Amino acid sequence: MYLLRIRSIASRARAGRRQSFGVFSSFAPNSSHILIGDAEKRRVWTAGLEYSHRLWGNDSLRLDYEGSVSPFFQERDPTVVATYPTVSTVGLISYVEALPSIGERVVYATNNPVGYVGLGDGSIVYVYAVYGSTKTYALAISPLGARVSGFSSHRLQPTFSADLGMVFSSRDLPVDGTASSNFLFSFGPGMQLIQGSSAIRLEYLYRHMSNANSGDYNPGVDSGVFRLTLSRLRTR
């Protein structure tokens, strides 16, 4: 009877927590056309702070407001580091067509030809690219967010989060001619484990970054993101 009473008190405490303060890190190992973004092969790391506050809840279900800021936001974009033709063209080139510049960040890091050169005899030779990566640093804020948690009186809880914010970078993202200010939204499921006044949450999110056609070009970036959050829970 005494143990049941202790468990009941602990369950009510988990369901009754009002707010939390946390630190998080996320990693997107790749990007592709998942839903609406086109830019490929981006890697993004973030780290920051999260705040959440209960909006509504009972022993079974809970709705929280959540907001976050990521002072560390690093994106690695595929970049042309060299180009080469399939055969030697020394002294034979009469014109060059549609080759990317060395150091240019590209939307698609393709194994297909990136251009061609015309030879004096009228034939053409296709040119391929060698890719490296370029780092761009940014600040991300997501002031509008919500998280639904199931089994809110239990230690292990399924969650679903959705966040909306912006990214402010030191140069255009993901390529030149886009924009240095981009909109950001993400959503996806997760699992949260609560132990006393602490919690750990692991999520897998779909995230999209876009300038909403405010730049000359808007390829957009779609990523699958792993996010890990460590939180301190408070009842006031």
Q: PLM features: residue spans?
A:
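Outer-membrane beta-barrel "beta-signal"
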Residues: L193, G220-R236
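Residues that define the transmembrane beta-barrel architecture of outer-membrane proteins
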Residues: R17, K41-A47, K135-S142, L156, ...
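Transmembrane beta-strands of outer-membrane beta-barrel pores
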Residues: S25-S31, V69-D77, L164-D172, Y206-S210, ...
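Extracellular loop and loop/strand-boundary signature of outer-membrane beta-barrel proteins
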Residues: H33-D38, Y128-S133, R171-G177, N211-N218
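Transmembrane beta-strands of outer-membrane beta-barrel proteins
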Residues: Q19-V23, L61-V69, P158-L164, F183-F187, ...
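Flexible, surface-exposed loop regions and adjacent strand-edge segments
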Residues: G37-R43, P78-G91, D176-N182, Y217-S223
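Gram-negative (and chloroplast) outer-membrane scaffold detector with strong preference
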Residues: R42-R171
